Each structure stands twice: as C-alpha cells, then as structure tokens.
C-alpha cells in the first residue's frame, strides 16, 4: 500500500512548505469515534480563534491605558499555542483513536490537562498574563468602558473553551478506560517504540490475520463428460 500524502495544514501552493501531517477522519478514525475526534478538532480551532480575539482585546486594553506587556504576551501565545496545541494534544488524541494507542492516550491526558488548567487561568484573567479574562475585563470598566466591553469577549470564549475541554477529557477518559487502556500498555508501547508512529487498526488487523486465504479461490477442475467412469 502506497504511503499517504500529507494534507495538513492545507497550505497554498505558492508557499514553499509542504503539509506536515496526514489527516482524514473518515479514512483513519473508527466510525464510532469520528464525531468525538471531530469535535476535539473543532475545539482546537475554537481555542485558536479565542487566542486571536484575545490579541485584539489586549490591543484595546493597551489603547485604553493598560500595559503593553499584555499585548506582547498575547501575540506570543497566539504564535506559540496555535501550532503547539495541535501537535501536543490534538495529534496524540487523533493517533490514539486511530491506532488504539495507550501511550498517545496518556500523552493527551497529561498535556490536555495542563492546557485545561492554563485555559482556566486565562479565563480568570490575571493581570500581566497576556489574557483578557474576567478579572481584567471587569476591573477595567472604571478606566475605559469601551475597551472593557471588547475584553469581555475573550473572557467568555476562554470560559467556553475551558468548559468544552473539561467535557472532552472526561469523554475520552471514559472511552479509554472502557476499552481496557492502562499505564502498562503505554509502557509497552514506549519500550517497543510503536508510540512514534502507531499503525492504524486496519494495519494491525492485517498483520494479525495475514493472508490466510488466496485473494481469489481456486476453481475446481472437473473432467469432461466422456471421462467420467
């Protein structure tokens, strides 16, 4: 079987950089898990959009009299977390469901859990963190009501992101435990090296079953009517 060509991210042809990953939900993810994995993918997209809105809100915060440090950090968060969140927690959960990989499930739980905690902190909105959360937005109404209204939007979006992350991690954990996943399986994948590029479920089945039967069964050959005894 020929190697699948990478298709994500879908970059324009004039950019001299090729896609880094192959992503196809209907082709690689089991039917019963496709809806959940697609929702986690949309959650990643929503979080990236939240970081973009947060950058605009931090600019309004700065124009309204706030610190420019928040705008600078918001820019760093957008550039850093957009690709890193995809690589560090969406790809692990994608590969986990694609290949039933305990190691990738464990990686997802650990990194996505840290992402959840960070998103909660961003929703709270401590000053100097580069995030327009509830504390920073509400506290800025006395200085610039217009800027504070803009700052409320990322606060709401960060809160929605955190709630969706909590739901996602609970659903994934329930499926993981129900399928018999364990830390011992993750250790086995680590020791054997299969965690780097775990084979799909279809490939695992083919390796296990092998070619037990020929592709086309042999048609029996019978003697002509004159040759029968």
UniProtKB/Swiss-Prot annotation:
GO cellular component: recycling endosome membrane; trans-Golgi network membrane
Cytoplasmic side: 1-39, 170-229
Transmembrane segments: 40-60, 61-81, 105-125, 149-169
Membrane topology category: Multi-pass membrane protein
Residues bearing the modification Phosphothreonine: 194
Domain of life: Eukaryota
UniProt keywords, alphabetically: Membrane, Phosphoprotein, Protein transport, Transmembrane, Transmembrane helix, Transport
Primary location class: membrane
Residue ranges the record marks as coiled coil: none
Family: Belongs to the SCAMP family.
Annotated protein name in UniProt: Secretory carrier-associated membrane protein 4
Organism of derivation: Pongo abelii (Sumatran orangutan)
């Amino acid at each position: 079987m020929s190697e699948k060509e990478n298709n994500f991210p879908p970059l324009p042809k004039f950019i001299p950089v090729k896609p880094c990953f192959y992503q196809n939900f209907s082709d690689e993810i089991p039917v019963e898990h496709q809806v959940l994995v697609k929702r986690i993918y949309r959650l990643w997209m929503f979080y990236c959009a939240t970081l973009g809105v947060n950058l605009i809100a931090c600019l309004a915060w700065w124009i309204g009299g706030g610190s420019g440090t928040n705008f600078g950090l918001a820019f760093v968060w957008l550039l850093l977390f957009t690709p890193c969140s995809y690589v560090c927690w969406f790809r692990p959960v994608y590969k986990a469901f694609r290949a039933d990989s305990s190691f990738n499930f464990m990686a997802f739980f650990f990194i996505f859990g840290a992402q959840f905690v960070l998103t909660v902190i961003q929703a709270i909105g401590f000053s100097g963190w580069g995030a327009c959360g509830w504390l920073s937005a509400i506290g800025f109404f006395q200085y610039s009501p217009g800027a504070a209204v803009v700052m409320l939007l990322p606060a709401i979006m960060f809160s929605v992101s955190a709630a969706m992350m909590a739901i996602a991690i609970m659903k994934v954990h329930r499926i993981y435990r129900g399928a018999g996943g364990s830390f011992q399986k993750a250790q086995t994948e680590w020791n054997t090296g299969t965690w780097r590029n775990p084979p799909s479920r279809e490939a695992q089945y083919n390796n296990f079953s092998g070619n037990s039967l020929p592709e086309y069964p042999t048609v029996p050959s019978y003697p002509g009517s004159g040759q029968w005894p």
